[in-house]
Amino acid sequence: LVSAGFTLLNALYGFFVLPESLKKENRRNFEWKKANPVGSLVQLKKYPSLAGLIGSLVLVYIAAHALQSTWTFINIDRFQWSKKTLGLSLGVVGVMTMIVQGGLIRFINPKLGNERSVYVGLAIYSAGMLAFAFANQSWMMFVFMIPYCLGGIAGPALQGILSGHVPPTEQGELQGALTSMISLTSIVGPLVMTSLFSYFTSPTAPVHFSGAPFLLGSVLLLISAILAYYVLRQEKTEPNVEPNIEPGFGGIKGFVREAPE
């Protein structure tokens, strides 16, 4: 109920307070057929690269639920952590995430560029997950939070690349589609990760391995990196890549690819 209230307040604040970010010449008329998740995705199919890049981002968000959905269970099972230690650990993760996404990312991503930030970030993120999976001492979980949180540079960089693949008039449509897909991962991710934890800590499991969700998360992040690399490399080699009408909008060197009519 409280969450619903905050969501409503957020919507009202956005509607009445936040200014329109697009210039008048970049706006378009409201259409009901596009004002829904399915409609947004259908309209964006004219940009073929988006499917692979959105898939890459979806894998990142599913992988993130390895920590979000099972952190408490895993550390109680493995290290018998108390409520105090669990709360402290999550607080440390929160502070580190805030430092990376609220500060470091402003220096790291411009230096590396969006594309390289995606690869480096996902590699570090995957390494952090893998380390969590096989940690056998409590202190290791705190140390391995560093690469895990540093991997947070990948998500914004990937979203920046996605934004660079559509013109300014379709940015809202893109963000709506991304929000819908990310919301779906909040259903799929917890279900997959908690089920995996439950199975590998049950008496019927071939081996007791509470870190299985982190291992799966690490693999998903590697697949995400490979998928992003494949899509972005294809863009550079295919002839139907045209310069973006708004250079520097976030894509690779301002590239946008549209399907032939």
Which residues make up each language-model segment?
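Short amphipathic helix-loop junctions that connect adjacent transmembrane helices
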Residues: S69-L86
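Juxtamembrane intracellular "pre-TM" segments in multi-pass secondary transporters
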Residues: P19-S56, R78, E242-E261
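Multi-pass alpha-helical transporter architecture, strongest
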Residues: A11-V17, L215-G254, P260-E261
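C-terminal transmembrane helical hairpin of 12-TM major facilitator-type secondary transporters
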Residues: E115-L158
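A membrane-interface helix-boundary motif in multi-pass transporters
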Residues: L1-A4, S82, S195-L221
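Pair of pore-lining "gating" transmembrane helices in MFS-fold secondary transporters
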Residues: K46-T70, I146
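Helix-to-loop junctions at the C-terminal end of transmembrane segments
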Residues: V100-N114
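Loop-to-transmembrane helix entry/capping segments in MFS-fold secondary transporters
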Residues: K83-K84, V166-S180, V207-H208
